[in-house]
């Protein structure tokens, strides 16, 4: 079998396609959650803690002071952008919560399905029956 043929068989298997769809949907979901955090959640949290915009919180590790984060970045100053880290952490927590809720719902659906009935045992083959009869006859002698 050629390399290309093997790759086609691998790529067209159901679980590989499912994985690809999951990655694409996950990427889109990540963008939605990122927007939710940056544009909805963090402005509300910032307002509740005194009008702070978390995106602009940073520590300047250099000796020169700058008015804004953008000015410090433009000058190439060494920075610790802990506001961006807070945003990313909240972003992660929301994604983790959404995945947890989705998996919990899927598991609940799986539990509510009745278990599949156990298959009936296959009838014993004739040669096995004959061998048992011979064994039993030999035991009685």
Curated annotation (Swiss-Prot):
Family matches, as Gene3D superfamilies: Large-conductance mechanosensitive channel, MscL, domain 1
Cell compartments where the protein resides: Cell inner membrane
Record bears the keyword Nucleotidyltransferase: no
Topological type in the membrane: Multi-pass membrane protein
Transport keyword on record: yes
A Pfam family it matches: MscL
Reported function: Channel that opens in response to stretch forces in the membrane lipid bilayer. May participate in the regulation of osmotic pressure changes within the cell.
Protein name from the UniProt record: Large-conductance mechanosensitive channel
Organism: Azoarcus sp. (strain BH72)
Gene that encodes the chain: mscL
């Amino acid at each position: 079998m050629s390399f290309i043929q093997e790759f086609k068989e691998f790529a067209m298997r159901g679980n590989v396609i499912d994985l690809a769809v999951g990655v694409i949907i996950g990427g889109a979901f990540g963008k939605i959650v990122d927007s939710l955090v940056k544009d909805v959640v963090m402005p509300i949290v910032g307002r509740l803690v005194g009008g702070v915009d978390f995106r602009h919180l940073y520590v300047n590790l250099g000796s020169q002071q700058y008015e804004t984060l953008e000015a410090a970045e433009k000058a190439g100053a060494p920075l610790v952008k802990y506001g961006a880290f807070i945003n990313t952490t909240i972003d992660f927590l929301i994604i983790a919560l959404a995945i947890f809720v989705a998996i919990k719902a899927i598991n609940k659906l799986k539990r509510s399905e009745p278990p599949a009935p156990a298959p009936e045992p296959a009838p014993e083959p004739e040669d096995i029956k004959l061998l048992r009869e011979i064994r039993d006859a030999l035991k009685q002698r």
